[in-house]
């Protein structure tokens, strides 16, 4: 475009001359017409193609590598220097942690400007011919810097109009042990990611680009180097949008009403302090104000020790739980659990615990728990806020009256146990719209595990319960904490850190989402202080009124 315009008089002439001196060209081998046609033919036929200057592969989805993209090393050094002088901003949420520059669209630095022209004029024209896609001149390019423990978890890059993603690496000597690889996932019959089948190692002046599609799932693995940064320029070429397949919805997790259970289970398992009427009233008041509470030393010490011993013995059958664009952790197979762990799972599903939780939180989780019609004059109306204390959004609720706390320890649970049939309860609870239900699992958390917020996350009113085991020496900087955020926002409302024998209760509304932050390699420090530890466990349950 500049070549078609007459030179401006005055000081503009040296500037244009300067720009001509800083120019970028990509590999002559790639621009050869014969090679370009061969790559275009392979792209069109969806067949692999390999040449010393360029490699195209279809497994697990279409991607291409040009090992020496820019011709001039002097240009690359100048570009590298300009990039490091930029202001970087920390990017942090459930999906990623790294540093990113401002958009490079309007930067005036000579090397950055020259690269931008190369990518979105010369290379875009070449890529349009190769791919057969009418790529638009839209500029979308930024610089990313990944340092120790930074990562970008599994995602597909799909956004309206994105057709081809690219990454130009400007890293020093690099190998797989340093992490930071571009990992590519294969997919199942539902077009959901399964496992990593290919990893591309960054190297100086390597360009990787791939077709953005419903199956282009990839991640940047955690950077493991404490000395070296992983610097890259990345962006997208835009064009006509592809038609997306119908959204896949996972089968819903079964929910069940409480299990009829003698109230003695509470006295057998739970710290007696939490069965005291006055203390329950105090807890309920705090919970209704904050919508969250952490109850320390929740289980009796001897019971907690039995649970930890069973978990440490290794007799539990663990199964990896995905898909990785939504979650990655291990879940216990309940059919083969040791007896004490089965009993603990039964505790959290028991009628007695439903009633105890009703009295600790003021929620209607049992037909004996007071409803709004039973509201007492002493207590009046109470507010249940959203997940974080101090937020103004929330749902108005009515707490239990003090006179109802005599059932806190489940003293009336047994005599009503026979009425716990789901159908009977449903009839009883029509005015409440549903029978109280729960779902739960026993999870193991290790380095690399996480959960993500995703587009199909169902948001509803619910009480989250977590009981943590094996957290000795666990630090917040390791990750593994549960973070609550408002829908559409990255700012954290509440963080629940794993803590031994602590029961976390959090009430969330329809505008509140949660995730477990990626557990990074700093977590390996735990095993140095506690050799028998390589992560932690939690009993995770959700209760619905």
UniProtKB/Swiss-Prot annotation:
Annotated region described as Disordered, given as residue ranges: 1-23, 371-437
Residue ranges constituting the Fe2OG dioxygenase domain according to the UniProt record: 137-239
EC class (word): oxidoreductase
Top-level taxonomic group: Eukaryota
GO CC term (a single one): cytosol
Entry EC no(s): 1.14.11.-
InterPro entries: Oxoglu/Fe-dep_dioxygenase_dom, Oxoglutarate/Fe-dep_Oase_C, Pro_4_hyd_alph, TPA1/OFD1_N, uS12_prolyl_hydroxylase
Binding of Fe cation, residues: 155, 157, 218
Organism annotation: Mus musculus (Mouse)
Record note on cofactor: Binds 1 Fe(2+) ion per subunit.
Composition bias, Polar residues: 402-417
PROSITE patterns, A to Z: FE2OG_OXY
Protein name in the entry: Prolyl 3-hydroxylase OGFOD1
Pfam families xrefs: 2OG-FeII_Oxy_4, Ofd1_CTDD
Binding of 2-oxoglutarate, residues: 169, 230
Acidic residues bias: start-end ranges: 371-380
Biased composition (Low complexity): 383-393
Lineage of the species this protein comes from: Eukaryota, Metazoa, Chordata, Craniata, Vertebrata
Family, per entry: Belongs to the TPA1 family.
Keyword ATP-binding: no
Cofactor(s) in the UniProt record: Fe(2+); L-ascorbate
Catalytic activity as recorded in UniProt: [ribosomal protein uS12]-L-proline + 2-oxoglutarate + O2 = [ribosomal protein uS12]-(3S)-3-hydroxy-L-proline + succinate + CO2
């Amino acid at each position: 475009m500049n070549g078609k315009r007459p030179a401006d008089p005055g000081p503009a002439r040296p500037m244009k001359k300067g720009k001509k001196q800083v120019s970028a060209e990509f590999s002559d081998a790639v621009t050869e017409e014969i090679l370009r046609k061969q790559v275009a033919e392979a792209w069109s036929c969806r067949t692999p193609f390999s040449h010393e200057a360029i490699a195209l592969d279809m497994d697990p989805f279409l991607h291409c590598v040009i090992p020496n993209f820019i011709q001039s090393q002097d240009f690359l050094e100048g570009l590298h220097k300009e990039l490091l002088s930029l202001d970087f901003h920390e990017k942090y949420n459930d999906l990623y942690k790294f540093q990113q520059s401002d958009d490079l669209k309007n930067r005036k630095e000579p090397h950055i400007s020259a690269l931008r022209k190369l990518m979105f004029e010369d290379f875009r024209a070449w890529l349009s011919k190769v791919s057969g896609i009418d790529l638009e001149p839209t500029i979308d390019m930024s610089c990313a810097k990944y340092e120790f423990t930074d990562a970008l978890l599994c995602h597909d890059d799909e956004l309206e109009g994105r057709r081809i993603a690219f990454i130009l690496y400007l890293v020093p000597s690099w190998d797989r042990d340093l992490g930071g690889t571009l990992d590519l996932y294969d997919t199942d019959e539902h077009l959901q990611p399964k496992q990593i089948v290919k990893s591309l190692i960054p190297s100086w002046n390597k360009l990787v680009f791939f077709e953005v599609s419903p199956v282009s799932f990839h991640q940047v693995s955690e950077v493991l180097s404490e000395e070296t940064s992983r610097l890259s320029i990345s962006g997208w070429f835009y064009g006509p949008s592809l038609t997306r397949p119908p959204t896949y919805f996972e089968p819903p997790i079964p929910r069940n009403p409480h299990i009829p259970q003698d109230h003695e289970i509470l006295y057998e398992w739970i710290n007696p302090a939490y069965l005291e009427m006055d203390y329950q009233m105090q807890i309920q008041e705090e919970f209704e104000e904050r919508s969250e509470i952490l109850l320390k030393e929740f289980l009796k010490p001897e019971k907690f020790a039995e649970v930890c011993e069973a978990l440490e013995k290794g007799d539990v059958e663990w199964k990896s739980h995905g898909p990785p664009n939504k979650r990655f952790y291990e879940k216990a197979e309940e059919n083969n659990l040791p007896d004490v762990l089965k009993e603990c799972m039964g505790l959290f599903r028991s009628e007695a615990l439903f009633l105890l939780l009703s009295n600790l939180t003021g929620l209607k989780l049992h037909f004996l728990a007071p409803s709004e019609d039973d509201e007492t004059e002493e207590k009046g109306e109470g507010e249940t806020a959203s997940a974080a204390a101090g937020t103004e959004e929330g749902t108005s609720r009515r707490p239990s009256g003090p006179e109802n706390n005599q059932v806190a320890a489940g003293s009336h649970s047994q005599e009503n146990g026979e009425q716990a049939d789901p159908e009977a309860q449903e009839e009883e609870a029509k005015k409440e719209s549903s029978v109280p239900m729960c779902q739960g699992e026993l999870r193991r958390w290790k380095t690399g595990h996480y959960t993500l917020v995703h587009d199909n996350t169902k948001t509803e009113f619910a009480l989250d319960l977590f009981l943590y085991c094996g957290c000795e020496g666990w630090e917040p900087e390791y990750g593994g904490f549960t973070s609550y955020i408002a829908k559409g926002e990255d700012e954290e409302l509440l963080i629940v850190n794993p803590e031994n024998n602590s029961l976390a209760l959090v009430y969330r509304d329809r505008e509140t989402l949660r995730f477990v932050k990626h557990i990074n390699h700093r977590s390996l420090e735990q095993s140095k202080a506690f050799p028998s530890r390589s992560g932690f466990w939690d009993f995770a349950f959700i209760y619905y009124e």
